[in-house]
């Protein structure tokens, strides 16, 4: 839970800039890489190198099966030759290496990554993207032009990258849920302090029933997200990585969609409570303004809310007995 505490600094992209690669780019290497790859990364990634997860493309966000970046083996069969583009890649502008999702020659998704995978020196071009939430995250548009990576850096079996990606999404979305729940609790704290301090119509804001109603809704959303998060976290701590991938994808998807949806409602309520200060980038309402301006980003990371809700339902339906009926 150290990562969520960074949300309280008031800069949404600061935590992403520091830790995003470790949270979503490195786990596939440690969980699916060969022993040689893992040994190499355990030495080079200990505070010395940055790595990014490169999956999203201009034409494929939540639809990971629609990736157009290709990986073709070299004539000697020792390297992957990678061509394509990646978009909205967090930490991409300053990363040393990339964990890349691509399609192989047989049109099945494959995943390749390691310290030698696709480096900035391996025929790749980076462009910083101008987003509304923060430049501190180093979000990039990446072009791979005949970039090369050793075949030994493939994560998991060739053609089995879809399992690697989907299982990694669980951890990625869980971290987003941690951030969302903590940020909402931070907004509740700001609003409780402000409504106790601010006077309107000759008395504190929190003496007004309509304000207390908004506070009640904010607290209910924040605490329900936190409680659900702790339940899933307990299950994660008592399951193997493979069990998490097969049993928790649906619940985590539901929680992520729910928590970011709650976050948007909380942001809107917080602005109403702070009034003009809630849309001012400086002063007492600066945290509320920043949260309201950047909350939409959380709803898209790791899969759009509607896509995640559908994923959760499909996971539940898949586990139902074929003869289930009233």
What are these regions (language model features)?
Residues 1-9, 17-19, 32-35, 74, ...:
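Alpha-helical interface subdomain recognition
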Residues 2-8, 113-119, 145-149:
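Short Ser/Thr-interspersed hydrophobic loop/turn segments at strand-loop and sheet-helix junctions
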Residues 4-13, 17, 28-57, 75-78:
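FAD-binding glycine-rich core of flavoenzymes that anchor FAD
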Residues 63-65, 91-96, 135-136:
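Short glycine/proline-enriched turns and hinge-like loops at secondary-structure junctions
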Residues 69-72:
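A structural signal for short hydrophobic beta-strand segments in well-ordered beta-sheet cores
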Residues 78-124:
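A short core secondary-structure module
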Residues 118-150:
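Flexible, small-/acidic-enriched active-site or ligand-binding loops
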Residues 146-164:
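Long, acidic (Asp/Glu-rich), low-complexity accessory segments flanking structured domains
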């Amino acid at each position: 839970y150290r990562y969520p505490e960074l949300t309280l600094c008031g800069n949404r992209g600061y935590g992403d800039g520091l830790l995003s690669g470790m949270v979503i780019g490195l786990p596939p290497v440690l969980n699916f890489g060969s022993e040689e790859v893992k040994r190499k990364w355990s030495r080079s990634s200990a505070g010395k190198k940055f790595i990014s997860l490169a999956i999203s493309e201009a034409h494929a966000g939540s639809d990971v099966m629609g990736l157009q970046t290709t990986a073709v083996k070299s004539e000697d069969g020792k390297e992957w030759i990678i061509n394509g583009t990646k978009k909205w890649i967090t930490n991409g502008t300053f990363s040393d290496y990339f964990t890349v999702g691509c399609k192989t020659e047989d049109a099945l998704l494959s995943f390749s990554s390691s310290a030698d995978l696709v480096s900035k020196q391996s025929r790749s071009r980076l462009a910083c993207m101008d987003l509304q939430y923060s430049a501190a995250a180093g979000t990039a548009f990446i072009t791979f032009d005949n970039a090369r990576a050793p075949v030994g850096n493939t994560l998991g079996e060739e053609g089995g990258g879809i399992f690697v990606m989907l299982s990694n999404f669980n951890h990625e979305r869980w971290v987003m849920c941690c951030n969302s729940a903590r940020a909402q609790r931070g907004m509740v704290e700001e609003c409780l302090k402000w409504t106790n301090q601010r006077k309107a119509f000759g008395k504190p804001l929190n003496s007004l029933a309509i304000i207390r109603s908004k506070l009640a809704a904010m607290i209910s959303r924040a605490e329900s997200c936190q409680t659900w998060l702790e339940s899933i976290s307990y299950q994660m701590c008592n399951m193997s990585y493979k069990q998490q991938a097969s049993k928790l994808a649906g619940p985590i998807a539901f929680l992520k969609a729910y928590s970011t949806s709650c976050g948007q409602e909380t942001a809107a309520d917080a602005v109403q409570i702070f009034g003009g200060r809630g849309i001012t980038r400086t002063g007492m309402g600066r945290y509320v303004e920043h949260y309201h301006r950047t909350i939409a980003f959380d709803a898209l990371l790791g899969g759009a809310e509607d896509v995640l809700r559908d994923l959760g339902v499909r996971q539940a339906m898949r586990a139902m007995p074929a003869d289930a009926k009233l």
